[in-house]
Amino acid sequence: MIDNCIANQASKEFSVSEISNKIKELLENNFGYIKVKGEISGLKRASSGHAYFNLKENTAILACTCWRPILAKIKFPLNDGMEVVIGGKLSSYSGNSRYQLSVDNLQPAGLGAMLQILNERKTRLEKEGLFNKKRIPIPFLPDKIGVITSITGAVIKDIIHRIRERFPTRIIIWQVSVQGENSGHEMAEAIEGFNNLEEIHKPSVIIVARGGGSIEDLWSFNDEILVRAAYNSKIPIISAVGHEADYTLIDLAADKRAPTPTAAAEFAVPVRSILNNTIQSYEKILFNNTNRLIKYHEQSIVNYDKIHSYFSYYINNRQQLLDEIGFNLLDVLIRFIALKETKIKSFSKERINYAKIINYKILELTHQTAYLFKSVNNTLKNFEYKLELNSTLLASLDYHNVLKRGFAIVKGDAGNFLSSKSAATNEQSLNIKFFDGEINVVLSCHDLNTRSN
């Protein structure tokens, strides 16, 4: 087409601007969107925000112009010597009679260049603290799980299958591209979208997943906007990118990293059967502990009976001792009075005028008698006080007083104590003890049905 155009214009005379415009037209019409791989050299940034550089390969050089809006979208710094792949359109610049490539898209080319960009970005984001946030714990039993991935691959099928196999839970899928120029933005918007849902629709945990691939395939998961979205998420995020050996920047910002998408599903939900076994084990432990507690209290009742018997015996002995002391004091008092009377009579028989002596002795006897009665009275009061204390203690330990307040002791066929309705269900008859006696009750089928209802 170019050859035909030149042949048709062979005899025509052009001005400088005409031939420049013609060349520009030929370039733009015959070369559409192209991709060129090369090494950046002579990079210059103008005050206007545009960037100018050459793309070279050996001795060949292609001038390139990167306008400010395009330059702002590039997420890594441009440097001389960096190998890149540039997409854009060819055009000519009439100011110096040269053609140039107008940049629409620029990506690093080669593993070395990509690793350099990755390390620089990782260092910068790490200094900002994006990888040192307080991790949000993954909920034990999430009611809803959000999954951000492509719906065309095997990843989503593996995740759904694994969750349904372990513990069926509602899954909300946010479809995104996991590879390509805008995939990082799509995944970041998905994270923000889940966080902005109403609480009733919001998932309890988010899984960001993709299958394995090369560093180029997984490059979107190193996108800065995606890393920041994961850092700012109020919902815990599980990253599951590639295989166990693959590592991306979102793994450092996520709340938990899974080596594979299937492992992410395992982190999100437990195994229902294992959970059921654990609950049954706890139920058995609770049942055994309850039985031990019942037996302990049954033994306590037996011990209280023994204590009651001991204190009854102790109080009876003290009462008997008190009675003996009372009898002895009375005998002593009678003998003392009789002795004094005998002395008085002997004085009268001898007709000796002992009036003063007798009066003195009578007064002395009166004082001694008063003292003796006071001493006996104090002793009796002391014993009565101790008896009252021991009786009060005995009454507090006597379970018969509890029965007088309306309680009863229920025993089964084997004489075992029954403390609950469910324990009485397996018994044929019951022995019920009240404070004033006990009765035996035979349970009928009607009683059992009524009790079950």
UniProtKB/Swiss-Prot annotation:
One of its GO terms (biological process) is DNA catabolic process. Its EC number is 3.1.11.6. It is found in: Cytoplasm. One of its GO terms (cellular component) is cytoplasm. Its main location: cytoplasm. Keywords: Cytoplasm, Exonuclease, Hydrolase, Nuclease. It is an enzyme of class 3 (hydrolase). The keyword Cell wall biogenesis/degradation does not apply. It catalyses: Exonucleolytic cleavage in either 5'- to 3'- or 3'- to 5'-direction to yield nucleoside 5'-phosphates. The keyword Lipoprotein does not apply. GO terms for molecular function: exodeoxyribonuclease VII activity; nucleic acid binding. InterPro entries: Exonuc_VII_L, Exonuc_VII_lsu_C, OB-fold_nuc-bd_dom. Belongs to the XseA family. PANTHER family: EXODEOXYRIBONUCLEASE 7 LARGE SUBUNIT. Bidirectionally degrades single-stranded DNA into large acid-insoluble oligonucleotides, which are then degraded further into small acid-soluble oligonucleotides. Heterooligomer composed of large and small subunits. This is Exodeoxyribonuclease 7 large subunit. The gene is xseA.
